[in-house]
A protein has these predicted regions:
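Conserved SAM-binding loop of SAM-dependent methyltransferases across substrates and taxa
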Residues: 227-238
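Conserved beta-strand/loop positions that form the S-adenosyl-L-methionine
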Residues: 223
Length: 261
């Protein structure tokens, strides 16, 4: 689709009531330009504004990534696009059990951000969107090696800390507690992928004689074990070794204990 036609359709979607998310995303995409630190001039206000707007646009988009992940919208889109190539807001609303108006808002924002494609020739009353296979793998398939949305789950918690805990922490010098369900889950899910795809098949193979010693016994300490994924994986890989995890987060420890039960 020509860029002018695509822009016109996105504008039509915005006019239909998609709200601040798409407007901010469009402004971010059109106004920001790539800026390298070495190219920033001392008085380059354009570069400074572009960097600010990239950050704002990223925050707005991350919030909608979080919503899509939490409500299973990407998983629903993946299923719909695999079975019918594309989906309407009505389709997504029905499959994901959400309100149609909010499905429309979210899809339009996702199209503006480039995560889904607004198909050409779709009128305002029958907008059709497609989640491409690569994006479906990254956003909606936890078993795929390219799956990579886990860490977005901690973004709202980190932003909330910026509103509440961090200003006082900066003034007082006191720390901020690590314990948070979303943060723990995000890190835990991200680690699970790398344990499965990198640590077990790649890293262990580079440890030489250490692997042999662990196969005969020995002890392993996982400092900052989180939800226990690595502790469990290593215990299974080295059943004769003693594997102990250490963690300060009560939330993460509760997950680890549940997995070990």
């Amino acid at each position: 689709m020509p860029r002018s036609s695509q822009s016109a359709q996105l504008a039509a979607a915005a006019a239909a009531g998609v709200g601040l998310g798409i407007i901010a995303t469009l402004s971010f995409q059109r106004g920001a330009r790539r800026v390298d630190d070495d190219e920033d001039g001392e008085d380059d206000h354009g570069a400074a504004r572009a960097r600010v707007w990239r950050s704002i646009g990223g925050a707005v988009t991350a919030a909608q990534l979080y919503v899509g992940d939490k409500l299973g919208l990407y998983a629903s889109l993946k299923f719909l696009c695999e079975t019918a190539y594309a989906a309407t807001p009505e389709d997504l609303a029905f499959h994901a059990h959400i309100d149609e108006r909010w499905a429309r808002e979210w899809l339009a924002q996702q199209a503006a951000a480039g995560f889904v494609k607004l198909l050409p020739g779709t009128g305002d009353s029958r907008l059709r969107f497609r989640l491409k296979r690569a994006y479906a793998d990254v956003l909606a398939d936890p078993n795929h090696e390219e799956y990579d949305i886990s860490l977005v789950r901690m973004v709202p918690a980190l932003v909330q800390r910026a509103r509440t805990a961090l200003p006082e922490a900066f003034r007082s010098g006191r720390g901020v507690a690590y314990d948070d369900e979303d943060i723990s889950r995000a890190i835990d899910d991200a680690h699970a992928k790398h344990i499965r795809l990198v640590l077990l098949p790649v890293v262990l193979g580079k440890l030489g004689s250490i692997v042999g010693r662990l196969e005969r016994g020995g002890a392993i300490a996982d400092l900052g074990c989180g939800g226990g994924n690595l502790v469990i994986a290593l215990a299974r890989r080295f059943p004769l070794a003693k594997v102990v995890g250490f963690e300060v987060s009560d939330t993460a420890l509760a997950v680890a204990r549940k997995r070990l039960a």
